[in-house]
Amino acid sequence: GAPASAAQAPLATKLAVHRRFLADCASGASLGELLAPLSELLHDPGAPQLTFALWVTLFPRAWAQLRTEEQEALVKPLISLLSKEWHVRQASASPNVVQGWLQALLACKPMPKIPAAVLQYLGKTFNAWHLAIPMLEHHALLYPNEPQWYDALSALRTALGERDSFCSLWSRRATHPETRLALALEQYGAWTAAQQAYVDCMTRWQAGETVLVNTPRAELQLWEYGVLRSAKKLNQWELLSEFAKQTQQPQLLMECSWKTSAWDLLKDLFYKYSLPDVPGIKMLQTYAAIHEGKLSEAEARCNDGIQFALQEWCGLPPLGVQSHTPLLQMFQQFQELQESAQMLMELNNAQRVGSVPDLSSILNTWRERLPNTWEELPAWNDLISWRNHMFSHINNVLGRLAEVPRHAEAKPGLASLGYQEMVWTVVRFAHVARRHALPEACINIIAKLQSVSTGIAAVDLNDTFSKMREQVRSCLQMPGLVPHGMQMLSQADIDQLSKPQQAELFQLKAELLLTESAEAADNGTAEAEAATAHLATAISMHGALPKAWLLWGGWCDRTFRKGGDVVWADRALGCYMQAILLRLDRARSMIPRVLALLAAAGQ
């Protein structure tokens, strides 16, 4: 006890001295003496957070002391102050003056009514998304009949990439159930159906239907943008190009021009229109410069584009949002443009000295650096379109080099190297389109590839199997094209394929026949029997084909359910177990059914 008391005595003495010091300051100091050090701290460049916090605390309290008419009189000067151009110089700083003003206004009660367009501009320009959006939501609740609040909210949500919030906002705001249906289809990724729904709305409105004739202008624009957005997702660039020409949208026409290889049109658009300094335009200018072989100009445009993209990145919220994804994809495209310029230099040097360039490092990197499977189709299309352009250029140069006998003997596949890379990449693109439940886009992608590869020996390309598999699987997703898939497989020359590939084609035939059997009015007995024959052929050719085992097991299981013959239960059990042993993910979901079949076989 004594040591503790001894230790507490000095502490009590120090606290008493400090208490007397504070009392002397409070009794003898004037207001000026208190404000002087505070003013010095507030003007310290190293303490912006203190200034920001003090302003946000004091201004709402001062605002609350004003009378209603005084508050209303101050709104117009506030709007004028927030709209001053000199604030832009501080846009990249955090915190900045505009953020301080908006956070203080957000805490005011009642909140001043700042116009929606001003809040939208301030939120986007000064990285004040988290302040502008709550203010817009507050005013939208107070003034539900004023559409400008919803327009600004929609614009900010779209800029942040929050498609679900955008669709939710419009679902509450839309005046027609047809609009809500189109938005729901879009949210679920059913882009073909969503596009058709938007087109139907526009067609009915143009026809003057009474239900849609009084549609608000904002909703009409939503339909139009919905059609364009769906067309981009579905890779319909020819359609978008025609629309851009008719509606005089130069930036959309520029985007379509390079993707459809209309380089002359793209160059004319650059000279015809005044272009903003945004990363997307700089990327298009880099594409055009590399296409024309102007590598120095391409490097300058690319560097400018990267700087503008970094500025946009700094203008986004610090937390990860969906709008970061397009910028990351843009950085990858700029990286590949730099690598494209490097490849052009190597190809030019190879033509000058007559040697074979070594492009394997960059080409292997491109194979490994594809977008993720779940990324949206436009991100894939941007990369694949440019890569295909480079592959065509590579093939033209290597084709000329392959005419030299010593090069042709050293590298027999030199002339078709560009086509091999193109085919592999485009087939991968088609596969992703099919996985996104966009079979029409998959078929169109393969069709364009076939037009490019006409006249190239299939043995050099080694793409027959991959293209056919993607086309047939797309037909499986579109029941109306099942006969087309059967015709394609029947006409295929499979002798050059390996045994596992031949077995998989027989399995695909069985899948098509089972699909026909399920839709047939007479239960499709003939198609089902033919399907089992093809499955037996596939398994006899290549036993390690788990999906064939699963399909066969499913057919045996359905036969057992219909007739009750335990023999079919035994066969289904064996097929399911074999598929599980071959580690097919889908087969694991059949384990409960396997247990049920074991019980049935035991009885």
Segments (PLM) and residue ranges:
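Long alpha-helical scaffold regions
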Residues: 1-170, 174-603
